[in-house]
Structures are given as structure tokens and as C-alpha cells.
């Protein structure tokens, strides 16, 4: 075994931990189908949200980690449950009244409310695929509608009929009495209306491959379970799909956890082997509620990318997948700055094992670009934007160029993008909420001390020396907690509760400019 393999197999980075579980489940052998299958799922009832991207990004991290550990070929499929009946109309789509007329219809049988594709389901699928394509995910797209209608699942559906009683014995104890009386794993597609029916099944015939139900008029209707004439309920569907496609690895949100045992048991009943599974925690909105495609109560993919590079979004997905995290606009600056820190550490690190533990290794699948920001962070640019209120990024570059003459927009495109992002973020989230603290007499003494200090130092004074001088002024002012001191300065000078390290900020903004800012508050 190579040293690289040794470092990878010993790594505690979660993608490697998951990859080792897959390798162990295979006993190091190539599956009969010739590859290891990774599957992600998508419910196209509403527009894809950032959690959809997150599942695919995380899945690829595990896939690439597995490829470090083994030369067994891999494949990733993204499976869309687009044959599901519409149960709820999303609030964030055009013409919701039109869509409401198609309740219980398969998503691929509803007209496209956006007017671009052959159906509502096709539009939602296209939105997901365009994003996955844009960011270089290598995957095969599977449509539930196509799989059912093309007969890909026919053999398994016949087996569900053959194992009907066994599956019902598994499922019925999980329901209330009222639901037990009507439940069946099969949902016929109504020959007249095209709706996905949740009706009691009066008769099932494995040899004929049919089920029989009563329509509203009391007539017995017999339909094949094959060829797209029936769809399985979502819990049996999950397990059937694992067995039919021979899935080796799947991850799903915590909302699936209670049913994961059922998925696995149904897979076994149908002769399959359940995949290795990872349950990740759900994202929460600003109020601590689960984010939802139908509500649109979170950041969209496009929203994040309006204010920050995609790498910062990937870092958010990488961090602690089994811990619930609040996902709203205020998490963006922190993730950008953490990405910058991890990137710099990666390129300074010579120990390969430590590189494997660095999130950027998994974000970039081992091919980590080197970025240079000269110590300028996103947060620092936001604060610079806050004091100079620029109309465009050229104003920020005026300060950046003085701070670091070697930096230019052409030679440092990452920093150039950050400047543009910072202005957008400031205008949309900070500017309207600035609230300045009117300085007290005590504050004015402090501000005068800062002004005197700035008048005494040279322009080339190092940031740490300036930071220490600011710190010493706070100590002299008699604050019990220096956090309160810095908070007062941020509120007086920036109109914010939080802010930068003043030493670095003053170096970037300029001593003379800082003097003007302080004088303006005296």
C-alpha cells in the first residue's frame, strides 16, 4: 500500500470515514454490476434549494474520498421523484392557482407554470440539472417517471406483488388504525384522470401483475403494476429503488431517519442489500424552522452566489453534516473568511495527513487552488465598505492598492470578486441597519486618545502595533470587559455591534482616513 493510501485510510475527515464504511461493506470486492453506486434524491415539488446542492456536494466528497481508497469504478446518480402526486402548492412559484387545479397529479403531468418546459416536473428537474452541470458535478440523472414507464422497475414491482403480505406486515404497524384500513404499497394511476390514487387495494395478482381497486362509482378497476400504471408509496419506493439499482451509498436528511429501517427491510425483502447510509441534519431558517422547497424560507443557491464564492457555500456543506445548522444570510461572511483561512493553512501544510483533514481538500477533491488575499478578509472588506460607502469596487481597490501595492484586480481575481461581493452584501444587509452610538463624554476622551495616537504614528506602523495601542487605550479607560470597549467603538465609528481588528482595519483604511473618521465623531 502507498503512503498516500495509508494517510487516507487513517484520516478522521468524515468523507474518508464514510468511504471506509463503503469499502468495508464490499469486503474490498468489486460489486457484480462492476462499479460502486452513489445515489442522491431530489423531490421536485418545489424549486431546488441550497440543501439540494448540499446533498450532492457532500455525496461527491464521499465519492472522491472512496476513489482515494480504492480503484473500484464509481457512479453517481441523481434520482428525481418526479412521478409523485402533487400534495401541496409551493408559495414561491408563479400562477399557484393554476397549479392547484392539478392536485394529486404526477409532477410530470402538470403544465409548467414557468412556461419553459413540457411539465412542472421537467422544469424543476431542469433547474437542478443546470446547477449541477454549472458546477461540474459528474452524475447520471434518473427520472422516476421515466424509470417506471420504461419498465426499469417492472421486475421489482412484480416482486412487491409476490411479497405483498410480507411488506404489509412490515408497514402496517407503523400506521394509525384509520390509515391501516386503507394502506397499500401500490398507488394506481387513474386511467381517467391521471391522478396518483391513494386507495385501498381490493385484490392483487402476482401472476397477472395487476392490482384491483374501487373507483368512486363503486366499479372495480384492474390495472397493471408495471409500465408506469402504478407507483409505489414513498417508503416502499425507497427500498425498492435500492434493490433495483443496487445502490451502495445513500445519504438523506433527518426527516428520513425514522423510516430508514423500513427502507432497508423492504430492500432485503426484495432480495437487495441495503446501502451504507449517512443521515445528515437539516438546515434551519433564521427562526430555527426547517427550510422548505415549497415555502422558499431560506437562501437560494443564486442568493448565496450573489454575495460570496461557491467555495464558501461548499465549506458550509462540509462542516459538521450531522449537526443542525442555521442557514441564513448572516452565515455567509463567516464561511468566506473560514474558507480563506483553511486555504492558506492547506498550502502552508506539508504533512499530507493534515492536508487530508483540511476541508478544502474535500471541497476541491484534492486539487486545491491557491488564493492570495494579503491578509484581507471578507469581513474586513465589509467594514471598509461600511466607512467609505463605495459606488463600485474601484473605490475599495484604491485602499487595497495602498495597503498592498502588489495586489491588482487582474493578478488577484479572488480578491477582486470579494470586493464586488462585499459591496452587494453591505448594500443589501448592513447599510439599512446601521445604528450609530452618540459618544458620551467618556467616549470622547477615548476618541481623543485614539486621535492623538494616530497623529503620533508613522504610516508604515505595523497592524499589530496599532492594535496594541488601541487595546492599551481601552485598558486605560477602565473597562471591566474590553469587549464592551470595542463594541462601543464599533457602534460609534461603524454603526455596528461587531467589527474588525482595528489594527488591520486602520492599515487597510489608512491612518489619515481613520483620523478623519474619528474627528467626525468628536
Swiss-Prot record:
PROSITE patterns: AA_TRNA_LIGASE_I. SUPFAM superfamilies: An anticodon-binding domain of class I aminoacyl-tRNA synthetases (SSF48163), Nucleotidylyl transferase (SSF52374). One of its GO terms (biological process) is lysyl-tRNA aminoacylation. ATP binds at residue 293. A motif ('KMSKS' region) lies at residues 290-294. Gene3D superfamilies: 1.10.10.350, HUPs (3.40.50.620). Keywords: Aminoacyl-tRNA synthetase, ATP-binding, Cytoplasm, Ligase, Nucleotide-binding, Protein biosynthesis. It is found in: Cytoplasm. Its EC number is 6.1.1.6. This is Lysine--tRNA ligase. It comes from Rickettsia conorii (strain ATCC VR-613 / Malish 7). The gene is lysS.
Amino acid at each position: 500500500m502507498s503512503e498516500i493510501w495509508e494517510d487516507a485510510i487513517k484520516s478522521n475527515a468524515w468523507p474518508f470515514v464514510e468511504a471506509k464504511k463503503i469499502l468495508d461493506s464490499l469486503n474490498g470486492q468489486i460489486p457484480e454490476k462492476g462499479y460502486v453506486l452513489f445515489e442522491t434524491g431530489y423531490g421536485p415539488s418545489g424549486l431546488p434549494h441550497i440543501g439540494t446542492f448540499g446533498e450532492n456536494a457532500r455525496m461527491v466528497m464521499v465519492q472522491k474520498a472512496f476513489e482515494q481508497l480504492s480503484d473500484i469504478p464509481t457512479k453517481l446518480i441523481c434520482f428525481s421523484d418526479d412521478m409523485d402526486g402533487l400534495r401541496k402548492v409551493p408559495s414561491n412559484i408563479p400562477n399557484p392557482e393554476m397549479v392547484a387545479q392539478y392536485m394529486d397529479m404526477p409532477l410530470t403531468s402538470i403544465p409548467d407554470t414557468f412556461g419553459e418546459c413540457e411539465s412542472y416536473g421537467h422544469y424543476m428537474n431542469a433547474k437542478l440539472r443546470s446547477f449541477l452541470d454549472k458546477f461540474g458535478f459528474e452524475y447520471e440523472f434518473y427520472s422516476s417517471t421515466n424509470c417506471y414507464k420504461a419498465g426499469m422497475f417492472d421486475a421489482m414491482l412484480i416482486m412487491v406483488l409476490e411479497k405483498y403480505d410480507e411488506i404489509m406486515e412490515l408497514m402496517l404497524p407503523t400506521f394509525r388504525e384509520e390509515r391501516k384500513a386503507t394502506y397499500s404499497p401500490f398507488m394506481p394511476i387513474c386511467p381517467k384522470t391521471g391522478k396518483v390514487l391513494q386507495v385501498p387495494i381490493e385484490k392483487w395478482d402476482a401472476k397477472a401483475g395487476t392490482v384491483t381497486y374501487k373507483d368512486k362509482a363503486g366499479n372495480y378497476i384492474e390495472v397493471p403494476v408495471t409500465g408506469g400504471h402504478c407507483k409505489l408509496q414513498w417508503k416502499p419506493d425507497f427500498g425498492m429503488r435500492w434493490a433495483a439499482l443496487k445502490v451502495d451509498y445513500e445519504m438523506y436528511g433527518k426527516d428520513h431517519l425514522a423510516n430508514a429501517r423500513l427502507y432497508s427491510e423492504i430492500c432485503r425483502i426484495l432480495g437487495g442489500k441495503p446501502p451504507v447510509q449517512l443521515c445528515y441534519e437539516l438546515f434551519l431558517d433564521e427562526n430555527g424552522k426547517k427550510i422548505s422547497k415549497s415555502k422558499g424560507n431560506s437562501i437560494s443557491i443564486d442568493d448565496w452566489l450573489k454575495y460570496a464564492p461557491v467555495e464558501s457555500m461548499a465549506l458550509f456543506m462540509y462542516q459538521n453534516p450531522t449537526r443542525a445548522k442555521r442557514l441564513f444570510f448572516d452565515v455567509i461572511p463567516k464561511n468566506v473568511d473560514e474558507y480563506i483561512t483553511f486555504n492558506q493553512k492547506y498550502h502552508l501544510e506539508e504533512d499530507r495527513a493534515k492536508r487530508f483533514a483540511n476541508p478544502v481538500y474535500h471541497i476541491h477533491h484534492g486539487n486545491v487552488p491557491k488564493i492570495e488575499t494579503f491578509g484581507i478578509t471578507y469581513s474586513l472588506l465589509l467594514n471598509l465598505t461600511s466607512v467609505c460607502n463605495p459606488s463600485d469596487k474601484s473605490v475599495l481597490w484604491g485602499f487595497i492598492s495602498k495597503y498592498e501595492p502588489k495586489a491588482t484586480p487582474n493578478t488577484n481575481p479572488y480578491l477582486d470578486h470579494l470586493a464586488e461581493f462585499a459591496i452587494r452584501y453591505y448594500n443589501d444587509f448592513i447599510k439599512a441597519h446601521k445604528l450609530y452610538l452618540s459618544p458620551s463624554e467618556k467616549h470622547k476622551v477615548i476618541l481623543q486618545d485614539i486621535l492623538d495616537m494616530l497623529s503620533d504614528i508613522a504610516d508604515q506602523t505595523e497592524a499589530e502595533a496599532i492594535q496594541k495601542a488601541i487595546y492599551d487605550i481601552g485598558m486605560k479607560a477602565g473597562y471591566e470587559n474590553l469587549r464592551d470597549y470595542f463594541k462601543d467603538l464599533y457602534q460609534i465609528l461603524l454603526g455596528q455591534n461587531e467589527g474588525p481588528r482595528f489594527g488591520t482595519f486602520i492599515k487597510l483604511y489608512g491612518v489619515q482616513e481613520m483620523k478623519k473618521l474619528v474627528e467626525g465623531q468628536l
